[in-house]
């Protein structure tokens, strides 16, 4: 009592304490960063290596494998995947959550150094690494377009000036430039002209290499002066290479222009980028794993004027895609929902108390508790995100509960004629333990969440801590500020009601009287209530097993990402046409605002597209509905598929795929993997639970297999090296020389002019100069025939891997899909040499599914322990926890009614219900025990009186929690797919719980009291210990 009196009789100190809490919260709010979700990105590092011209199999065996063996020894690597394609290898290392990305980067560099001696000597550069996840969607895409400059020149500006500057901005992890390649001088050779002049391709290569050198020439000095020697040893443009003499034939000079077309072009012509219908260079910016997306985007935007000033005015630099607007809009929606929740909760208090003066008290207590939470959030390193703001929205109903319980009890004493200060002290003393029990037991619900590991634990931690802090501050406020305000603001007389509120008061009285009559009947028919209670427990189990489940609600972020997968033998020209066709289909959709895409590089049969949808207010369909509509149109395009998926704020894993979920096949037997993967993929494609089934196994590319006749080669004076060099010179876009410029280095690229390589007959025009100087056609010593070859080779760990990706059709859940895949694998009889497992988000879903029931049981057990300690009883916690089955049934039925799968967000709702619904029982049990101890009442009389006496605060607290969650259910706009499952779960659980626990709790209380008496050593004792 002294504790309460300290604050009740010292109003100035109490007010200043509350002001201090509020000011700290305001200061913390202003410094909190903004993010879509808590920081849950896995530390990811990408290692890249190249060996131009090497086949995917060569890259996998000679480059990827040595690097994987060295990188796999690094501590904290949770997943290692690699993909090797023509001339390049990319290895993705995913680390444990607690691994520092900078320390991991140092270990990666050390591992690369250790493997260096095992790598091929012909690699043009050492392997490099980047601290970014290539499978993440870019946080921003910039485009460069121009009517004046060529694509190569635009690429040069992007890669030389813009990308390095952007990479230095805090939070930026990687800037990937696509759509073309660096400028180059391209030498397109005419095979027939070469043959006529007796010039080999090696002759051309050697002549160009020798004519373009950059070597130090030294200095000249005399007694007084010093001169640096400079020569015209470099050729920089196509016009300078054109007259270069490469050979003499019968005394006549053969110039490069006589046997080749020399142009100023780009290093790799097999690249294309577009924005809407215009050729463009794309700068795809990804953030560091630990970076804040909003802060990073804002920093980039702040530098854009400076970046624009560094490039010519004829180049248009535009933002094609920006993730931040939808994130900001989503957070604004949550903030509005929070304000509405506060207003509704205060309205509930006003209706029940029917006094403006009394309503002011919770109207002050709620903001103080919520605002003060921001200070703790800042100290914990949290952010303003959807989950933390949802925690505060839900906390509105919780924090007002404490104030309501105290206020209502004090108001009851005032209505009985007690003086205000005395009523404040007496009323607070009576319910102080009740408020403490409710708050501590509610916080106890979240202890298992705080101990939960992995991505779900990291994701829920901010929610749990934020809500717990809000409840803790609310507990302090309700026992200090609330009784002080009651003592000094409320009057001893019964408050005057407005005429419009008298009807509500009479309705409440009638409702209480009706409840009393029905409760008497229930207490006389306890067996029926027991059957109902057991039925709800069984119904909980059945509903949980049968309800569709998923990991996280599908978000509508306003951004779609698409992967193009074409026939494996498609040419680059045809692939570029497919990109244009797909972009036109998407651009014509009324819901699309902007579309960018690119294709080319080492995988000519694939491409990527990034689609920005119009804001939610300007379109009626969700992202998934738009995808469903576009899927029908895109399916009509022959020879290629475009798989669309909505970009999510949570993506697990580093392997790039064309769909949201992955199922990975592993095998140490590559032949077995290549045999079974098509069978499994075709089977999965028939399942109605899956959509957009595709695979990264690309083992059916067209190959022209040349077989050398070594005996003939020896007789003709030709070695294999010369023959291979011929093919590389002719068809490999071989970089044969370097042009040095002040800002960058450019290449001279040699190949047979594409005009002469339109079909297989181009091989017949190739020849080698033998050791006698004679031109020997390739067909003299080699035969060729078409064959199949892999376009890529994938590993996971050190095993061969193939990942099958899939999306979910509308109306299907991830649990449906995973169960269907497991059944299909069993039906196919896949051998033990091929192992299948879910990857990425689907893998985390499997792990979460296995721990959900354990987590709920742990939460219930923790609450039981806390209540047992508080009540010094084994029995009363069971009475209080008997309220949970009805809440579970209500929550699961509500999810079924709204066709919402059981997700991680719904699990949060279930955990919250464990904390919410037991409050009713706590208020009943506390007053029943008090009545038995001091009122000499029988258990039945005590619990009956407690139920009637606490009916008004029970209704107030339940309706406050319900109205606090109702805006989450009714909210629309950005981010509503995250808010609605939480609101649906809580509202459904509260409604069902309120209908049943007002009757089941008294019955359970009496049951355990009789049970206690039966086994008690003191049967005559009537007051519960």
Swiss-Prot record:
Topology of the protein relative to the lipid bilayer: Multi-pass membrane protein
GO CC, one annotated term: plasma membrane
Key word Nucleotide-binding present: no
Swiss-Prot/TrEMBL keywords: Cell inner membrane, Cell membrane, Membrane, Transmembrane, Transmembrane helix, Transport
Signal peptide (UniProt feature, chain positions): none
Transmembrane segments: 3-23, 333-353, 360-380, 387-407, 431-451, 463-483, 528-548, 853-873, 875-895, 897-917, 953-973, 984-1004
Pfam families linked to this entry: ACR_tran
InterPro entries in UniProt: AcrB_DN_DC_subdom, Acrflvin-R, Multidrug-R_MdtC
UniProt subcellular location: Cell inner membrane
Molecular-function annotations in GO: xenobiotic transmembrane transporter activity
Induction: The mdtABC operon is transcriptionally activated by BaeR.
Similarity section: Belongs to the resistance-nodulation-cell division (RND) (TC 2.A.6) family. MdtC subfamily.
Function of the protein: The MdtABC tripartite complex confers resistance against novobiocin and deoxycholate.
Record note on quaternary structure: Part of a tripartite efflux system composed of MdtA, MdtB and MdtC. MdtC forms a heteromultimer with MdtB.
Database matches in HAMAP family: MdtC
Protein name stated in the entry: Multidrug resistance protein MdtC
Lineage summary: Bacteria, Pseudomonadati, Pseudomonadota, Gammaproteobacteria, Enterobacterales
Chain's gene name: mdtC
């Amino acid at each position: 009592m002294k504790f309460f009196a300290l604050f009740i009789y010292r109003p100035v100190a109490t007010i200043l304490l509350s002001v201090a809490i509020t000011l700290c919260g305001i200061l913390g709010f202003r410094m909190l960063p903004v993010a879509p979700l808590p920081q849950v990105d896995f530390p990811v590092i990408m290692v890249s290596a190249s060996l131009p011209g090497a086949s995917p199999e060569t890259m996998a065996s000679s480059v990827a494998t040595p690097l994987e063996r060295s990188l796999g020894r690094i501590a904290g690597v949770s997943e290692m995947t690699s993909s090797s394609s023509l001339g390049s290898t990319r290895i993705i290392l995913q680390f444990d959550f607690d691994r520092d990305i900078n320390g991991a980067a140092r270990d990666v560099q050390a591992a690369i150094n250790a493997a260096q001696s095992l790598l091929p000597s012909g690699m043009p550069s050492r392997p490099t690494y980047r601290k970014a996840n290539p499978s993440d969607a870019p946080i921003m895409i910039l485009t460069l377009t121009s009517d004046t400059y060529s694509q190569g020149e635009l690429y040069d500006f992007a890669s030389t000036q813009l990308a390095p500057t952007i990479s230095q901005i805090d939070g930026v992890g990687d800037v990937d430039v696509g759509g073309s390649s660096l400028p180059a001088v391209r030498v397109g050779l005419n095979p027939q002209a070469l043959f006529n002049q007796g010039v080999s391709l090696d002759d051309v290569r050697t002549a160009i290499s020798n004519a373009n050198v950059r070597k130090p020439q030294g200095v000249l000095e005399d007694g007084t002066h010093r001169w640096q020697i400079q020569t015209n040893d470099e050729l920089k443009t196509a016009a300078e290479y054109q007259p270069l003499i490469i050979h003499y034939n019968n005394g006549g000079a053969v110039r490069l222009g006589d046997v080749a077309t020399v142009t100023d072009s780009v290093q790799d012509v097999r690249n294309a980028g577009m924005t809407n219908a215009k050729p463009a260079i794309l700068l795809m910016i990804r953030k560091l794993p630990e970076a804040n997306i909003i802060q990073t985007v804002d920093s980039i935007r702040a530098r854009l004027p400076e970046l624009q000033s560094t490039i010519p005015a004829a180049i248009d630099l535009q933002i094609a895609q920006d993730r931040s607007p939808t994130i900001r809009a989503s957070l604004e929606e949550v903030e509005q929902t929070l304000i509405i929740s506060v207003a509704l909760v205060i309205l509930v208090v006003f209706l029940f108390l029917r006094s403006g003066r009394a309503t002011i008290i919770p109207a002050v207590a709620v903001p103080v508790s919520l605002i003060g939470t921001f200070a703790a959030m800042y100290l914990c390193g949290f952010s303003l995100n959807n989950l933390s703001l949802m925690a505060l929205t839900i906390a509105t109903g919780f924090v007002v509960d404490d104030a309501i319980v105290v206020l209502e009890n004090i108001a009851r004493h005032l209505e009985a004629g007690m003086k205000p200060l005395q009523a404040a002290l007496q009323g607070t003393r009576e319910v102080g333990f009740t408020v403490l029990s409710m708050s501590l037991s509610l916080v106890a619900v979240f202890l298992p969440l705080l101990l939960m590991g992995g991505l779900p634990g990291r994701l829920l931690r901010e929610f749990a801590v934020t809500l717990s802090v809000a409840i803790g501050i609310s507990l302090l406020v309700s026992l200090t500020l609330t009784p002080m305000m009651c003592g000094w603001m409320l009057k001893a007389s019964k408050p005057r009601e407005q005429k419009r509120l008298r009807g509500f008061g009479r309705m409440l009285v009638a409702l209480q009287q009706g409840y009393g009559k029905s409760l008497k009947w229930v207490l006389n028919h306890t067996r029926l209530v027991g059957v109902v209670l057991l039925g709800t427990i069984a119904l909980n189990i059945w509903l949980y097993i049968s309800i569709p489940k998923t990991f996280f609600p599908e978000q509508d972020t306003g951004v779609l990402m698409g992967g193009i997968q074409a026939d494996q033998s498609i040419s680059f020209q045809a692939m570029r046409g497919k990109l244009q066709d797909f972009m036109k289909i998407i651009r014509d959709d009324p819901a699309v605002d902007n579309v960018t895409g690119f294709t080319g590089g080492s995988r000519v049969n694939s491409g990527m597209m990034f689609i920005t949808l119009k804001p939610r207010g300007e379109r009626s369909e969700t992202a998934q509905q738009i995808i469903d509509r576009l899927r029908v149109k895109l399916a009509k395009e022959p020879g290629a598929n475009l798989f669309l998926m909505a970009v999510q704020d949570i993506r697990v894993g580093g392997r790039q795929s064309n769909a949201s979920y992955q199922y990975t096949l592993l095998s140490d037997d590559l032949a077995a993997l290549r045999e079974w993967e098509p069978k499994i993929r075709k089977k999965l494609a028939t399942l109605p639970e899956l959509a957009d089934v595709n695979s990264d196994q690309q083992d059916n590319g067209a190959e022209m297999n040349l077989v050398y006749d070594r005996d003939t080669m020896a007789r003709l004076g030709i070695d294999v090296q010369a023959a291979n060099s011929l093919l590389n010179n002719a068809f490999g876009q071989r970089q044969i020389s370097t042009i040095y410029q002040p800002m960058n280095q450019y290449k001279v690229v040699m190949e047979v002019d594409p005009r002469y390589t339109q079909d297989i007959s181009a091989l017949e025009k190739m020849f080698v100069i033998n050791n006698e100087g004679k031109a020997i056609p390739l067909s003299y010593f080699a035969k060729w025939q078409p064959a199949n070859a892999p376009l890529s080779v994938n590993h996971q760990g050190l095993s061969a891997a193939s990942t099958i990706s899939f999306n979910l059709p509308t109306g299907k859940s991830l649990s449906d899909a995973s169960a269907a895949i497991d059944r299909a694998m069993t039906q196919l009889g896949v051998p033990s040499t091929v192992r299948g497992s879910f990857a990425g988000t689907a893998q985390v879903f499997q792990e979460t599914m296995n721990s959900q029931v354990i987590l709920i049981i742990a939460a219930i057990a923790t609450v039981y322990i806390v209540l047992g300690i508080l009540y010094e009883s084994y029995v009363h916690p069971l009475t209080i926890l008997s309220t949970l089955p009805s809440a579970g049934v209500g929550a699961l039925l509500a999810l079924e009614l709204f066709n919402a799968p059981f997700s991680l967000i719904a699990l949060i709702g279930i955990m919250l219900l464990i904390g919410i619904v037991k409050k009713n029982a706590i208020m009943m049990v506390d007053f029943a025990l008090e009545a038995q101890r001091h009122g000499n009442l029988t258990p039945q009389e005590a619990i009956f009186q407690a139920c009637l006496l606490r009916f008004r605060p029970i209704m107030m607290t339940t309706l406050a929690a319900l109205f606090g969650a109702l805006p989450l259910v009714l909210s629309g706009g950005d981010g509503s797919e995250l808010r609605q499952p939480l609101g649906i779960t809580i509202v459904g659980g509260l409604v069902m719980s309120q209908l049943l626990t007002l009757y089941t709790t008294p019955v359970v209380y009496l049951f355990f009291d009789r049970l206690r008496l039966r086994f008690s050593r003191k049967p005559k004792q009537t007051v519960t210990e």
